[in-house]
Protein backbone atom coordinates (compact mmCIF):
# COMPACT_ATOMS: atom_id res chain seq x y z
CA UNK A 1 0.00 0.00 0.00
CA UNK A 2 1.24 3.49 -0.87
CA UNK A 3 -0.63 6.74 -0.12
CA UNK A 4 0.90 9.76 -1.86
CA UNK A 5 0.21 13.01 -3.68
CA UNK A 6 1.32 11.07 -6.75
CA UNK A 7 3.59 13.76 -8.16
CA UNK A 8 6.41 11.31 -8.96
CA UNK A 9 4.22 8.45 -10.18
CA UNK A 10 5.03 8.72 -13.84
CA UNK A 11 7.26 7.17 -16.47
CA UNK A 12 9.83 4.57 -15.46
CA UNK A 13 9.44 5.22 -11.72
CA UNK A 14 5.73 4.46 -11.88
CA UNK A 15 6.25 1.37 -14.03
CA UNK A 16 8.99 0.08 -11.73
CA UNK A 17 6.70 0.43 -8.69
CA UNK A 18 3.87 -1.44 -10.39
CA UNK A 19 6.17 -4.12 -11.82
CA UNK A 20 7.69 -4.68 -8.36
CA UNK A 21 4.31 -5.96 -7.17
CA UNK A 22 2.59 -2.88 -5.76
CA UNK A 23 -1.03 -3.88 -5.23
CA UNK A 24 -2.62 -0.60 -4.07
CA UNK A 25 -1.81 3.06 -4.69
CA UNK A 26 -3.92 5.98 -3.51
CA UNK A 27 -3.58 9.50 -4.93
CA UNK A 28 -4.34 12.23 -2.38
CA UNK A 29 -6.05 15.01 -4.34
CA UNK A 30 -7.52 17.76 -2.15
CA UNK A 31 -9.22 20.23 -4.45
CA UNK A 32 -11.32 19.57 -7.55
CA UNK A 33 -9.65 22.05 -9.93
CA UNK A 34 -6.29 23.80 -10.28
CA UNK A 35 -7.32 26.73 -8.06
CA UNK A 36 -8.68 24.73 -5.12
CA UNK A 37 -5.87 22.16 -5.40
CA UNK A 38 -3.24 24.90 -5.25
CA UNK A 39 -4.87 26.36 -2.14
CA UNK A 40 -5.16 23.10 -0.19
CA UNK A 41 -2.13 21.19 -1.46
CA UNK A 42 0.19 24.23 -1.76
CA UNK A 43 1.16 22.96 -5.19
CA UNK A 44 0.64 24.08 -8.81
CA UNK A 45 0.74 20.48 -10.07
CA UNK A 46 -2.97 19.65 -10.34
CA UNK A 47 -2.96 18.77 -14.06
CA UNK A 48 0.25 16.77 -13.75
CA UNK A 49 -1.09 14.67 -10.87
CA UNK A 50 -4.37 13.98 -12.69
CA UNK A 51 -2.39 12.93 -15.77
CA UNK A 52 -0.17 10.69 -13.61
CA UNK A 53 -3.28 8.99 -12.23
CA UNK A 54 -4.65 8.39 -15.74
CA UNK A 55 -1.33 6.99 -16.96
CA UNK A 56 -0.98 4.71 -13.97
CA UNK A 57 -4.49 3.35 -14.42
CA UNK A 58 -3.84 2.62 -18.07
CA UNK A 59 -0.57 0.82 -17.27
CA UNK A 60 -1.44 -1.05 -14.07
CA UNK A 61 -3.26 -4.36 -14.26
CA UNK A 62 -3.30 -6.06 -10.87
CA UNK A 63 -2.46 -2.86 -8.97
CA UNK A 64 -5.58 -1.10 -7.72
CA UNK A 65 -5.48 2.67 -8.22
CA UNK A 66 -7.66 4.88 -6.02
CA UNK A 67 -8.04 8.58 -5.30
CA UNK A 68 -8.73 10.27 -1.97
CA UNK A 69 -10.53 13.60 -1.64
CA UNK A 70 -11.83 15.92 1.09
CA UNK A 71 -14.93 18.10 0.93
CA UNK A 72 -13.74 21.70 1.19
CA UNK A 73 -17.12 23.22 2.08
CA UNK A 74 -19.86 21.05 3.57
CA UNK A 75 -22.49 23.57 2.39
CA UNK A 76 -21.36 22.73 -1.15
CA UNK A 77 -21.03 18.99 -0.57
CA UNK A 78 -23.04 17.61 -3.48
CA UNK A 79 -21.36 19.86 -6.04
CA UNK A 80 -17.86 19.01 -4.79
CA UNK A 81 -18.71 15.32 -4.70
CA UNK A 82 -19.74 15.43 -8.36
CA UNK A 83 -16.55 17.29 -9.32
CA UNK A 84 -14.39 14.68 -7.59
CA UNK A 85 -16.30 11.86 -9.27
CA UNK A 86 -15.62 13.47 -12.64
CA UNK A 87 -11.90 13.55 -11.82
CA UNK A 88 -11.92 9.88 -10.88
CA UNK A 89 -13.45 8.91 -14.25
CA UNK A 90 -15.05 5.78 -12.84
CA UNK A 91 -11.95 4.66 -10.95
CA UNK A 92 -11.77 3.71 -7.28
CA UNK A 93 -12.49 6.76 -5.15
CA UNK A 94 -13.16 7.78 -1.56
CA UNK A 95 -14.50 11.19 -0.55
CA UNK A 96 -14.44 12.31 3.08
CA UNK A 97 -15.51 15.31 5.10
CA UNK A 98 -12.71 17.70 6.02
CA UNK A 99 -10.76 16.88 9.20
CA UNK A 100 -8.63 19.07 11.46
CA UNK A 101 -5.45 17.00 11.91
CA UNK A 102 -5.64 16.67 15.69
CA UNK A 103 -6.83 20.25 16.09
CA UNK A 104 -3.95 21.80 14.14
CA UNK A 105 -6.25 23.34 11.51
CA UNK A 106 -9.28 25.55 12.08
CA UNK A 107 -11.84 24.26 9.57
CA UNK A 108 -14.70 26.65 10.40
CA UNK A 109 -18.03 25.72 8.80
CA UNK A 110 -16.65 22.24 8.07
CA UNK A 111 -16.40 21.43 11.78
CA UNK A 112 -17.71 17.96 12.51
CA UNK A 113 -20.55 17.31 14.94
CA UNK A 114 -21.11 14.27 17.13
CA UNK A 115 -20.69 12.62 20.51
CA UNK A 116 -17.15 12.75 21.93
CA UNK A 117 -15.68 9.30 22.56
CA UNK A 118 -12.33 7.61 22.16
CA UNK A 119 -11.31 7.02 18.55
CA UNK A 120 -10.08 3.57 19.60
CA UNK A 121 -6.61 3.96 18.14
CA UNK A 122 -4.64 3.70 21.43
CA UNK A 123 -6.19 0.24 21.95
CA UNK A 124 -6.16 -1.09 18.38
CA UNK A 125 -3.55 -3.67 17.27
CA UNK A 126 -1.49 -1.39 15.06
CA UNK A 127 1.48 0.88 15.69
CA UNK A 128 2.31 4.08 13.78
CA UNK A 129 6.07 4.50 13.29
CA UNK A 130 7.74 7.55 11.73
CA UNK A 131 11.07 7.43 9.92
CA UNK A 132 12.55 10.23 12.04
CA UNK A 133 12.35 11.11 15.71
CA UNK A 134 13.40 13.49 18.46
CA UNK A 135 16.84 14.27 19.89
CA UNK A 136 18.69 12.27 17.25
CA UNK A 137 16.54 9.17 17.65
CA UNK A 138 14.69 7.42 14.84
CA UNK A 139 11.57 5.31 14.50
CA UNK A 140 9.34 7.60 16.54
CA UNK A 141 6.12 5.85 17.60
CA UNK A 142 3.04 8.08 17.38
CA UNK A 143 -0.54 7.51 18.59
CA UNK A 144 -1.89 7.73 15.02
CA UNK A 145 -1.35 9.48 11.70
CA UNK A 146 -3.54 12.42 12.72
CA UNK A 147 -0.88 13.94 15.01
CA UNK A 148 1.28 14.83 12.00
CA UNK A 149 2.54 18.33 12.81
CA UNK A 150 2.33 17.76 16.57
CA UNK A 151 4.98 15.05 16.70
CA UNK A 152 7.06 16.71 19.41
CA UNK A 153 4.11 16.48 21.80
CA UNK A 154 2.96 13.02 20.79
CA UNK A 155 6.02 10.76 20.59
CA UNK A 156 5.43 7.63 22.69
CA UNK A 157 8.90 6.16 22.21
CA UNK A 158 11.56 5.36 19.61
CA UNK A 159 12.27 2.00 18.02
CA UNK A 160 15.94 3.01 17.84
CA UNK A 161 16.00 2.77 21.65
CA UNK A 162 13.31 0.24 22.57
CA UNK A 163 11.41 -2.67 21.06
CA UNK A 164 7.83 -2.17 19.89
CA UNK A 165 6.65 -4.36 22.77
CA UNK A 166 8.53 -2.21 25.30
CA UNK A 167 6.99 0.96 23.86
CA UNK A 168 3.50 -0.58 23.66
CA UNK A 169 3.67 -1.58 27.33
CA UNK A 170 5.63 1.51 28.39
CA UNK A 171 4.64 4.48 30.50
CA UNK A 172 3.67 6.87 27.68
CA UNK A 173 1.48 4.42 25.77
CA UNK A 174 -0.14 3.17 28.99
CA UNK A 175 -0.91 6.76 30.04
CA UNK A 176 -2.47 7.47 26.63
CA UNK A 177 -4.80 4.47 26.97
CA UNK A 178 -5.75 5.57 30.49
CA UNK A 179 -6.54 9.08 29.22
CA UNK A 180 -8.76 7.67 26.46
CA UNK A 181 -10.53 5.50 29.04
CA UNK A 182 -11.26 8.37 31.45
CA UNK A 183 -11.94 11.00 28.79
CA UNK A 184 -9.12 13.19 30.11
CA UNK A 185 -7.53 13.41 26.66
CA UNK A 186 -4.00 14.79 26.20
CA UNK A 187 -3.65 18.14 24.44
CA UNK A 188 -2.72 16.56 21.11
CA UNK A 189 -5.96 14.53 21.15
CA UNK A 190 -8.38 16.89 22.87
CA UNK A 191 -9.33 18.95 19.81
CA UNK A 192 -9.09 16.14 17.25
CA UNK A 193 -12.33 15.63 15.34
CA UNK A 194 -11.67 11.90 15.09
CA UNK A 195 -13.00 11.80 18.66
CA UNK A 196 -16.40 12.79 17.30
CA UNK A 197 -18.81 10.00 16.42
CA UNK A 198 -19.91 11.21 12.97
CA UNK A 199 -21.28 8.32 10.87
CA UNK A 200 -21.54 10.53 7.77
CA UNK A 201 -17.84 11.45 7.64
CA UNK A 202 -17.28 9.07 4.70
CA UNK A 203 -19.26 10.90 2.02
CA UNK A 204 -18.78 8.43 -0.83
CA UNK A 205 -16.78 5.38 -1.84
CA UNK A 206 -17.12 2.81 -4.61
CA UNK A 207 -14.70 0.20 -3.29
CA UNK A 208 -14.27 -1.83 -0.12
CA UNK A 209 -13.21 1.15 1.99
CA UNK A 210 -14.78 0.87 5.43
CA UNK A 211 -15.34 3.87 7.70
CA UNK A 212 -13.83 2.13 10.73
CA UNK A 213 -11.15 0.02 9.06
CA UNK A 214 -7.79 1.42 7.99
CA UNK A 215 -6.30 0.28 4.69
CA UNK A 216 -4.33 -2.92 5.01
CA UNK A 217 -5.92 -3.92 8.33
CA UNK A 218 -8.65 -6.37 9.27
CA UNK A 219 -9.73 -5.01 12.66
CA UNK A 220 -12.69 -2.66 13.17
CA UNK A 221 -12.01 0.44 15.29
CA UNK A 222 -15.56 0.24 16.66
CA UNK A 223 -14.39 -2.78 18.64
CA UNK A 224 -11.95 -0.53 20.51
CA UNK A 225 -14.15 2.52 21.14
Where are the regions a protein language model picked out?
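Radical SAM/AdoMet-radical enzyme domain recognition
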Residues: 1-79, 93-96
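Hydrophobic "anchor" residues
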Residues: 134-142
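Structured beta-strand/loop patches that form or line metal/cofactor-binding pockets in enzymes
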Residues: 98-126, 130
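Flexible mid-to-C-terminal extensions adjoining Fe-S/redox cofactors in radical SAM and related proteins
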Residues: 141, 146-225
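Short, aromatic/basic amphipathic alpha-helical patches
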Residues: 79-89
Amino acid sequence: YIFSNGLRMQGKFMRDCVDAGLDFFRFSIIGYNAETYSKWMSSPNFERVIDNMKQMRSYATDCRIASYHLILDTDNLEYEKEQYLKLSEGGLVEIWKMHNWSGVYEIGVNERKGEVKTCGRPFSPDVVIRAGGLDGNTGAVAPCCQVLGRDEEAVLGHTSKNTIEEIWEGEEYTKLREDHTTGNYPDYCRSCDFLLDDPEVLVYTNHERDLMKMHGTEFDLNDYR
